[in-house]
Amino acid sequence: MENQNNIHRELTSLPVGKLLWKYSVPAIVGTMVMSLYNVIDRIFIGQGVGADAISGLALTFPIMSLAGAIGMLVGLGASARISIVLGQNDKVKAEKILANSLVLSLSFAVCYLTFFSVYMDDILRSFGGSDRTIPYAREFLIYIMPGMLCTNLCYSFNNMMRASGYPGKAMYTMLLGAFSNLILAPIFIFWLDWGIKGAAIATDIAMAISAAFVMIHFFNPKSQLRFHRRYFKLEWGILFNIVSIGLAPFLVNVASSVINAIINTSLYRYGGDEAIGAFGIFNSYATLVVMLIIGLCQGMQPIVGYNYGAGNYTRMKKAFVLTGIVATICCTVGWIGSTFFPYYIIRAFTTDTNLIDVAIHGMRIVMGVFPIVGFQIVTTNLFQSLGMASKSIFLSLTRQVIFLIPLLLIFPRIYALNGIWIAMPVSDTIATAITLLLLWRTDKKLQNKNSVITR
């Protein structure tokens, strides 16, 4: 009870800037670590195995994104609800959400693994794979998929650990896995000469270590929230709330997977395996920046959700505005790197000169309006944190589905390979304009609740 009261005082009275720093830094570390697993694999594989291997690894990105989508569906949906009910001082309901989330996460993971294990080759072929690249993709997936269960648990419950008042512990748990992967990957790839399967096995072991520490936390009687056997009985109302709120980030990742599959297919048609590899490289860089913003939003989420539940709208506004400013700065820095220093970024992944040239050209175009992306992501997460699932889902789909898919179907017919690159920044620009409009309209509707979201 004392710990719960301390968390209440912290979230409702600590200066917002200091609070956002406290919650965001661990969250950023967590999301960056998740991205670094993929980046580390790509760097070591690109340098140690070759250009075809890195193109093959790019084929697995949609499948890996879907695994992350399941983690977000449960983890972010549950953590948003936990923050709100803790703001309402309802610990029992928070622990019911926690227990139901474990059952839901395990069920989704088993279904996912079964499906992709059965249809792996057909899926890779539909994603733009060729006879040169599919063997590498298949080998990586065969070894990485058994570890997906741990990845799901780690990602889902790391968010809940943060939402229940343990941001620092959540950060250290993720760092433990990242350092393990950083040590094991070069040993398995180079020293043991396991190649691409070595990268997968290293990631599996690292995620298992992180997942074990997360689970130990929630079985610890001293934790703010913990598992109770009596709460593992599924409650449909709780499941609906988790899924409805988590649906937005889930759809973002599903959309990302679908878009990546469409992009890979188009890239193979207009640019061959090199174009797929190039996109895989600079998409890894862009994903690092985006995941930094996602971590920032996860740090914002308990502050916004808790104060929304407590009726403190002024603090909710301050957290949102500050998060938006920091996100824009981060995306601008990412744009500077992609525009002025692309060679050094791409060179870290490969020494193949043709691949480097294709990647530099595409990177500069795709990330051309990157500074505006942060605001769009933060606003989408604001609606998610407030439990406004429909708005969050809509904004999630505008950037990666509603506008991008038609552009990807039209532009390449006119501009060939450049058309694929151009479609992405055009979609980002339109989606951001829609986001501004929806934020303004929502604020007008919330005036009766003393809303100050955009003032």
Predicted regions mapped to residue ranges:
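Short alpha-helical transmembrane segments in multi-pass integral membrane proteins
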Residues: M1-S24, I82-G147, W191-L247, V304-V369, ...
